[in-house]
Amino acid sequence: VIDVLVVEAVAANLTILKSPTIFRQYDGRMWNWEGCGNEYGSCYGSCTHVWNYAQAIPHLFPKMERTLRETEFFVSQAKNGHQAFRSALPIRPIRHNFHAAADGQLGGIMKVYRDWHIYGNDEWLKLIYSYVQNSLDYCINTWDPKRKGVIEEPHHNTYDIEFWGPSGMINSYYTGALQAFVAMGEHLEKDMTEYRELLDKSIDYMENQLYDGEYFIQNLSLIHISEPTRHSLI
């Protein structure tokens, strides 16, 4: 028997799926607010670092969830790999005139891995793979230019601020994205040597530099780093 509090918590969250927070445009592609009030939507654009946390839709309606990945990587991503973390409505190419969100963009790579596993279709993975690689390369070049396996440069995130210096929170996204990408690439028989080396460095940094024995921490750094907008805007 499931405890009544658990039932209430699950039901209360799943009702969002039938609210105006979530809808589909004319061609079936999903587009979401972050939430909604009685007369308005709150924070537009299927925000990547907010929808990182949603796990119901990919398991209940995986085809619909995949349209979010296809929008993020095929439509809202620039040729240089910069990904807008809010997509336009109607869904269409967007101006890349704001920071990329480190947690949103890296989280999207892990979500591709998840969605591929749920779908079980290698053709879909092959279709999106080069876009995912382009996205990850942008993240590496922008936030880990020294190839240390750590998100070190100032980076925008879900708190609508820039983190200055490595943190357990954002670096876990980086580690996870590297691990997901290595797994996908190896499945497709790609040479993943460079990315696996970065993954090993990232795991080592997480365990030995960002864990104090009790908590994962942030190593605040305000010197010897680039100004955040210079790399995040194109």
Regions found by a protein language model. Give the residues of each.
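C-terminal ends of transmembrane alpha-helices
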Residues: 144-152, 208-214
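Single conserved hydrophobic/aromatic residue that forms the stacking wall/gate
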Residues: 223-234
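An acidic-aromatic substrate-binding cleft motif
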Residues: 1-55, 59
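Aromatic-rich carbohydrate-recognition surfaces in CAZymes
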Residues: 29, 40-150, 165-185, 196
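Short beta-alpha connecting loops at secondary-structure transitions
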Residues: 156-164
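Short amphipathic alpha-helical coiled-coil/interface segments
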Residues: 196-206
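N-terminal leader/propeptide and maturation segments of large enzyme subunits in energy/redox metabolism
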Residues: 1-10, 180-195
